[in-house]
From Swiss-Prot:
Gene name tied to this protein: lpxA
Protein name in UniProt: Acyl-[acyl-carrier-protein]--UDP-N-acetylglucosamine O-acyltransferase
Family: Belongs to the transferase hexapeptide repeat family. LpxA subfamily.
Record InterPro entries: Acetyltransf_C, Acetyltransf_C_sf, Hexapep, Hexapep_transf_CS, Lipid_A_LpxA, Trimer_LpxA-like_sf
Molecular function in Gene Ontology: acyl-[acyl-carrier-protein]-UDP-N-acetylglucosamine O-acyltransferase activity
Protein's organism: Helicobacter pylori (strain J99 / ATCC 700824) (Campylobacter pylori J99)
Length: 270
C-alpha cells in the first residue's frame, strides 16, 4: 500500500506503483511514473516524462525531469529514465534529454548521487557508480559501471568515462578516460590505474595483463592511437585489448593522457 502525504501535489495523470512513499510538499507532474517501492522524502519535484525504478530513494529538494538547461531545447518530447535501487540525495538536479542528443537521460541501478550533484541533458550513467557532493556533469556525458567521481568535480560535455575509473575530487575533466584509470587535476590527466576497483572486479592475472597493456600503450613512441591499433592487430581476440583499445580509437575528444603525468609505479596506483 502506498503512503502519500496530504500536502503532496500529484497529477492525476502520474502513475504511482505499489508501496510508494511520497513525503510532504512533493510535486509530481503529468508524465511521471514511479515503480513499486520508490520513496520520495519531503519537497521532491518530479516533472516531465520521468520514470523512477523500483526502490529508488530520493531525498529533500531534489529536482528531476524539469526542462533541460539548453538554449536549443524547444519543448520537444524527451525522457529521464532512472533505474532501480538508486540513492539520490538532497538538492540533486537531473535533466531529461534533448533533440540534439539521444532524447533521454539514462541512469542505471544501484548508484549513489550525493547532495548537489547536477546531471545535465542526454547523460548516460551506468550502474554501481558514486558521484560525490557537488559533482557537475555537462550534457551528453557517458559514464560506465563502477565509476567513482570525487566531490566538486566538473566534467565537460561529451566526455566518456569507461568502466572502473576513479576521478579525484576537485578535478576538471575535459577528455575521455579509458577503463580502470584514475585521473586527477585541473585539467585532469591519467595518473595510474584504479587497482582497488580492479581487485574487486577482476582476477589477478587479468589485472597484470591490463597493467602491462597500459605500459605498452603509454610509451612515448608510437602515439597512443598507433599503439592501440597495433595492440588490436596483435591481440584481436583478447577482450581487454578490445575494450581498452577500441575505447581509445573511438574517442572524439581525445584521451586524458599526458606522459609526464602518468606513473606505472605500484605505490601510485593503490
Amino acid at each position: 500500500m502506498s503512503k502519500i502525504a496530504k500536502t503532496a501535489i500529484i497529477s492525476p495523470k502520474a502513475e504511482i506503483g505499489k508501496g510508494v512513499e511520497i513525503g510532504e510538499f512533493c510535486v509530481i507532474g503529468d508524465g511521471v511514473k514511479l515503480d513499486e517501492g520508490v520513496k520520495l522524502h519531503n519537497n521532491v519535484t518530479l516533472q516531465g516524462h520521468t520514470f523512477i525504478g523500483k526502490n529508488t530513494e530520493i531525498f529533500p529538494f531534489a529536482v528531476l525531469g524539469t526542462q533541460p538547461q539548453d538554449l536549443k531545447y524547444k519543448g520537444e518530447y524527451s525522457e529521464l529514465m532512472v533505474g532501480e535501487d538508486n540513492l539520490i540525495r538532497e538538492f540533486c538536479m537531473i535533466n531529461p534529454g534533448t533533440e540534439g542528443g539521444i532524447k533521454k537521460t539514462l541512469i542505471g541501478d544501484k548508484n549513489l548521487l550525493m547532495a548537489y550533484v547536477h546531471v545535465a541533458h542526454d547523460c548516460v550513467i551506468g550502474s554501481h557508480c558514486i558521484l560525490a557532493n557537488g559533482v557537475t556533469l555537462a550534457g551528453h556525458i557517458e559514464i560506465g559501471d563502477y565509476v567513482n567521481i570525487g566531490g566538486l568535480t566538473a566534467i565537460h560535455q561529451f566526455v566518456r568515462i569507461a568502466k572502473g575509473c576513479m576521478i579525484a575530487g576537485k578535478s576538471a575533466l575535459g577528455k575521455d578516460v579509458p577503463p580502470y584509470c584514475t585521473v586527477e587535476g585541473n585539467r585532469a590527466f591519467i595518473r595510474g590505474l584504479n587497482r582497488h576497483r580492479m581487485r574487486q572486479l577482476l582476477e589477478s592475472k587479468d589485472i597484470d595483463f591490463i597493467h602491462a597493456l597500459y605500459k605498452r600503450l603509454f610509451r612515448p613512441i608510437p602515439s597512443l592511437r598507433e599503439s592501440a591499433k597495433l595492440e588490436l592487430e596483435e591481440h584481436a581476440n583478447n577482450p581487454f585489448v578490445k575494450e581498452i583499445c577500441s575505447f581509445i580509437l573511438e574517442s572524439s575528444r581525445g584521451v586524458a593522457y599526458k606522459s609526464s603525468e602518468y606513473s606505472s609505479e605500484e605505490k601510485q596506483e593503490e
